[in-house]
Amino acid sequence: MTTNTVSRKVAWLRVVTLAIAAFIFNTTEFAPVGLLSDIADSFGMETAQVGMMLTIYAWVVALMSLPFMLLTSKVERRRLLIGLFILFIASHVLSFFAWNFDVLVISRIGIAFAHAVFWSITSALAIRMAPPGKRAQALSLIATGTALAMVFGIPIGRIIGQYFGWRMTFLAIGLGALATLACLVKLLPTLPSEHSGSLKSLPVLFRRPALVSVYILTVVVVTAHYTAYSYIEPFVQTVAGLSGNFATVLLLILGGAGIIGSILFGKLGNQHASGLISLAIALLLACLLLLLPASHNPQHLMLLSIFWGVAIMIIGLGMQVKVLASAPDATDVAMSLFSGIFNIGIGAGALVGSQVSLHLSMASVGYVGAIPALVALVWSLMIFRRWPVSLEDHQPHHS
């Protein structure tokens, strides 16, 4: 009995360490969102030019997720994770020392390579290391790590950047990763590769219209969100004319509201996922349309960011559940594709936002983001009516 209790404790420690790793990997992807103005100032550039760094990072992750997953499919998982972390930490050290913008971009590409592999293996690892009968809880812990990065990662990164300079934010993330690596080395057993997806499952997945339509919805709605969200920090300072501190508060509120979205989805997601996702997309559309009108009043901006945070968390969780339900037989490949497609949306949104800022005006990012949001809303209503029960049908077997 005692041994069993100890092994359960160790199993949970392993999963928690993976969840912390998920938090760190997601924090670094979005940290630049809160630091665009500072990085731009230090290199004498426009924020919209620096914003391209978000696009490059996201698209590297998108392009490399599947190839890297296949290339590393036979590698023992403990060794692979250690290698990933070494690349991740070294790249952050390079970010800290980046003597020009090109070097910073190169360091971010190194981080993106590590990110691409990490996300293609981490859900499967959490399931393998979970105590017996606790697979769903293990997955939700990883999702929580991811969600908390949105809630606290970006604002904490911004606060460190505000007080100690943006380079310290990247160094702090690298140090956090070093501590996590030490825990992983101590806790992880040898993990031979198993159940890795292969290219054989790709044609099968792409012949599932319900799954493909969810992928299309993902890329469109994520593009809408990131068109405005990527530039929220310079928007608050230049368009709304508010302080850098207020931008930090706004990012905290938006992230914190994600917890409400997560709880709502946990309560209602199994039965009403389709309706909940469409409702959240409608809410996102309203937030984007109201972004500029709300910018004249700090209270209105704070209220808007609560609804925005709830909406985007429900959308993110809902899409994952839909993908898993449509591909219970090939979760690794389906989720690797989902991660890639999500990142295509992040990159596209950041790119559109930067072009709008450069050629129209920063004030228009919400209105331009509302266009794909409207398309996503119409598309979601169409596909969930066409395939209404794909999620609920598979749910009992999958959980």
Curated annotation (Swiss-Prot):
Pfam families: MFS_1. It is found in: Cell inner membrane. InterPro entries: MFS (IPR011701), MFS_dom (IPR020846), MFS_Efflux_Transporters (IPR050189), MFS_trans_sf (IPR036259), Sugar_effux_transptr_put (IPR023495). GO terms for cellular component: plasma membrane. Keywords: Cell inner membrane, Cell membrane, Membrane, Sugar transport, Transmembrane, Transmembrane helix, Transport. The chain crosses the membrane at residues 15-35, 50-70, 81-101, 103-123, 136-156, 168-188, 209-229, 246-266, 273-293, 301-321, 333-353, 364-384. GO terms for molecular function: carbohydrate transmembrane transporter activity. It comes from the Bacteria. The keyword Transport applies. It is a multi-pass membrane protein. Signal peptide: none annotated. HAMAP family: MFS_SotB (MF_00517). Involved in the efflux of sugars. The physiological role may be the reduction of the intracellular concentration of toxic sugars or sugar metabolites. Belongs to the major facilitator superfamily. SotB (TC 2.A.1.2) family. This is Probable sugar efflux transporter. The lineage of its organism: Bacteria, Pseudomonadati, Pseudomonadota, Gammaproteobacteria, Enterobacterales.
